[in-house]
């Protein structure tokens, strides 16, 4: 496939995925609960000291600090989609395993955990979000984080895998729900990379932006979010699904057991200011 054909293919897929989102804008009214965030984990002191997080993040807003962490760590971690999750899912164990070790890659699930815990260690509200596709035959998904910025008074999505985030027409960084909304109604939603160069797979930055735009559009149909955000894994999650979407049927088609079906949360949970 030529670069032009690839570009046309990604544009076509983008339009298909945006159409799916357009026809599924309204979310199910589920449990109205609050997510919690733990800033007191003893391991955060170790993480801050070992990796000099304050020196990396410097001063500024929560978003400015988080972007500096993203920009520092993302290029030093190799991506490995088929990583077996055989390392403890916490930033200390993961960074020890993969940082600046090209032969030891990890997946988005674990990359996002690193950035989340580095943010939490600096007192920044941060949570992982699983981005899930519409098709029950698509077993690939993505995991990112959101941080809360008090100057912007909003949540912002950051992605360790792509080393970037999305902005609207005014250049305002967007949350996961805002990215979904903008794609669904076909208004400006542009990918911004913190690095100035594109990955070798892409011929230029424009192609890289297009790829991630269609990739996110594919995976923004429904979401999982951890109920408690802390050091290490938390097994309790909420799911946020569009109306008329049969989550149980979808999961069964993917050959996952019923135990994997979390409670349905109200979408307002993702909009709330953290406390």
Give residue spans per PLM region.
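Secondary-structure boundary elements
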Residues: 8-106
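Mid-length scaffold segments of soluble, non-membrane domains
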Residues: 103, 107-110, 121
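Alpha-helical and coiled-coil interaction segments, frequently adjacent to or embedded
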Residues: 176-275
